[in-house]
A protein has these predicted regions:
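N-terminal intrinsically disordered, cationic/polar leader segments
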Residues: 2-158
Length: 158
């Protein structure tokens, strides 16, 4: 899928070029809102997709690392694995009232093991953070491009 000019939201991570670090971004297509992560590995793309999702709630740079949460999911299909991973992130945010700054992901076959790093939601420190009770993951896509970079994207409705 290619982007048309003006479709990237401001606040996206740094640009990705071969050899460059991973990035995340928000993409709009009409009324649809997508989160997208890119990286040199599938794991890096999943980390960045989770960053994009969390950035819809609070600016990750405003979040301190005070807690670590372990997350795990499994699926033989990368698209389904992405959806399950993002659901696990949202569940941790909603059930524990946390906001996250960063993620570390490791994959072993069909299983994904992740660590989310962040802090409890504090209205004084995070006055503009959105409350997350759930998310609808409408469509997910995972692929490796001709440039060798992995992309993981998902349409979201908070």
């Amino acid at each position: 899928m290619s982007l048309e000019p003006g479709q990237l939201d401001e606040g996206a991570g740094p640009a990705v070029t071969p050899g460059a670090p991973a990035r995340w971004e928000h993409v709009t297509r009409g009324s649809e809102r997508w989160v997208r992560g890119r990286g040199r590995s599938l794991e890096a793309a999943f980390e960045q997709a989770a960053m994009a999702l969390c950035a819809l709630v609070e600016d990750p740079s405003a979040v301190a690392v005070r807690e670590e949460v372990e997350l795990e999911c499994a699926s033989p299909e990368p698209d389904r694995l992405l959806a399950d991973w993002l659901r696990a992130v949202v569940h941790a945010m909603a059930s524990r009232h946390l906001v996250f700054r960063c993620f570390a992901v490791r994959r072993d076959g069909t299983r994904l093991f992740g660590h989310a790093f962040g802090e409890p939601l504090d209205r004084e420190r995070h006055p503009f953070a959105r409350d997350v009770r759930g998310v609808s993951l409408v469509d997910t896509h995972v692929w490796r491009g001709a440039d060798g970079l992995w992309t993981a994207e998902c349409e979201v409705e908070l």
